[in-house]
Amino acid sequence: MATIIHHGVHGHLYQSQKMNKALCEVLSTLLIVQPYESYRQFHVYEHHGRAFSTFEDKDLAAIYQLGFTPGKSKTELYAHLFLTLISPKFHLVFFYGRLKSNLVGVPPYRLVMTLIWWAALAGMSILLGTSATILILLLPFVVFYQMTSLLHLLTEHVWIVRGEGESVRESHINNSLARFCGEICPKSFAPKYIGHWAKWLAMHLLVHLPCRMLIVQGSLVCHDWHHRYGTVRQWYDYAKLREIHAHKLSIEERYDYHDIWGVHNALDYVFSSLSRQERSELQTARLTYRLN
């Protein structure tokens, strides 16, 4: 659903911008996330524009605000990630931002949609009871959604501020990652490789499949191509279009994509990149950020 909203704000779903907006408003109301207009302003005009890889990029600001700052060791970053994912404060602040974005500064029709949906959720909670509400609504809607949202955000880009002399387009290319789910097969089906096949199967069932379903859904696996050609409407064909372009660059010996297999490897790549930077003295509390 988040992938559909993402392409909706880019205007890729329907020819009619009103239809794109209507669908995004309905889906974002159901998910309790940022409304169409504010998300479009931030994502299309800032994150995909000149603000990318600067302190004006609210995604980068969110990463730094959460404590994933340059100069920290990989051990520090991994420990901080674990503590953040289980932190009540992180989840409460995140969820508060989601609630606020649906109430403050929204058009009257959106406020009505929000209140009706929240009333429906309250009614369902009463009918379901406490235990079922926690299992069916609170855990998926709040905790799991926010965990996977953070993991997606951390791994979609290398969160490094644009370097001196680096153009906006170069920063989009240099700091965007492809996150493919899977790994190479063992060499053969010979009995001696049975352990390798068992590991391969376990990784696909327990790591790559959940990551594909929960963290990098839809076209998010090739989000790097999207940052190069964000106006292309064929979002359902992004993987094929990226492969065509990658093949062309390879033939021309200009290949500059960052292909990473396994979301866990993408996370390690990002943390490695951050750890190699100089420790930042930036006062992150001053950054304007968003979590949604």
Ranges and model annotations:
Residues I4, K18-K21, T29-L139, L220-D224, ...:
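Non-catalytic, topology-defining segments of multipass membrane proteins
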Residues L13-L31, D59-F68, S167-A202:
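Juxtamembrane helix-capping/reentrant segments at transmembrane boundaries
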Residues H12, G163, V232-R233:
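Generic hydrophobic alpha-helical membrane-span motif
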Residues I134-L137, W197-V207:
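Short, motif-level signal for alpha-helix interfacial/capping segments enriched in acidic residues
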Residues H12, H47-H48, T155:
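Protein kinase-like catalytic domain
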Residues M1-T3, V26-E37, V142, L206-Q217:
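Membrane-embedded alpha-helical segments that form the functional core of polytopic membrane enzymes
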